[in-house]
């Protein structure tokens, strides 16, 4: 299982109750999953090649994650490379990259807010000129609301987009029109 934090504990416990040998992979830290897993590796859960190497060495039958989007691409990659059941890399990208997800939804005829992807703040005011405020900026590949900022007017635009860029792993941010409503 990729991840060893509080979000993964119920799933690790369930796997162990069902007699599974559980290997937890996550960056080094004080994560409770390391204490209950049968074996641990301290590796970034986005490092696909390192995780593939571990998976091959261990001869795993299943790879999964729970409660974290950032690990999904690595799970899909390893499953594809090892011929295990999984969602596949293309589906994982559609699920975890907010820009790719929006493009896919738009192309499928699903209504989406106006959006753009940026990797810097150069000419940012021109780039959003056809969008209505408020806006939202967020890293395309983050989860847990990290780097998400509401932008109420053009005066906040550069600062908030920079903050989102600072939270982005690959320096990509999506800016989209804000939609009022409940978050699910």
For each predicted feature, which ranges?
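ATP-binding N-terminal substructure of ATP-dependent carboxylate-amine bond-forming enzymes
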Residues: 1-91, 122
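A short beta-strand signature within small-molecule sensing/ligand-binding domains used
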Residues: 183-184
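Conserved SAM-binding loop
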Residues: 64, 94, 150
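Active-site nucleotide/adenylate-binding loops and adjacent lid/helix of ATP-dependent enzymes
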Residues: 97-180
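A generic structural signal for residues located within well-ordered alpha-helices
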Residues: 7, 70, 96-97, 131
């Amino acid at each position: 299982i990729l991840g060893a934090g509080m979000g993964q504990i119920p799933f690790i416990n369930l796997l162990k109750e069902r007699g599974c040998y559980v290997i937890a992979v996550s960056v080094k830290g004080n994560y409770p999953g390391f204490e209950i897993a049968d074996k641990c590796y301290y590796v970034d859960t986005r490092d696909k090649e390192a995780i593939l190497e571990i998976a091959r060495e261990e001869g795993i039958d299943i790879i999964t994650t729970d409660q974290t989007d950032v690990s999904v691409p690595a799970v899909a990659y390893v499953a594809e490379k090892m011929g295990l059941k999984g969602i596949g890399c293309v589906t994982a990208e559609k699920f975890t990259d907010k820009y790719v997800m929006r493009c896919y939804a738009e192309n499928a005829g699903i209504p989406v807010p106006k959006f753009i992807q940026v990797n810097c703040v150069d000419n940012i005011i021109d780039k959003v000129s056809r969008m209505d405020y408020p806006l939202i900026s967020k890293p395309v590949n983050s989860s847990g609301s990290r780097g998400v900022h509401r932008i109420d007017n053009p005066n906040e635009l550069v600062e908030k987009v920079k903050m989102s860029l600072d939270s982005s792993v690959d320096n990509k941010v999506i800016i989209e029109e804000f939609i009022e409503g409940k978050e699910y």
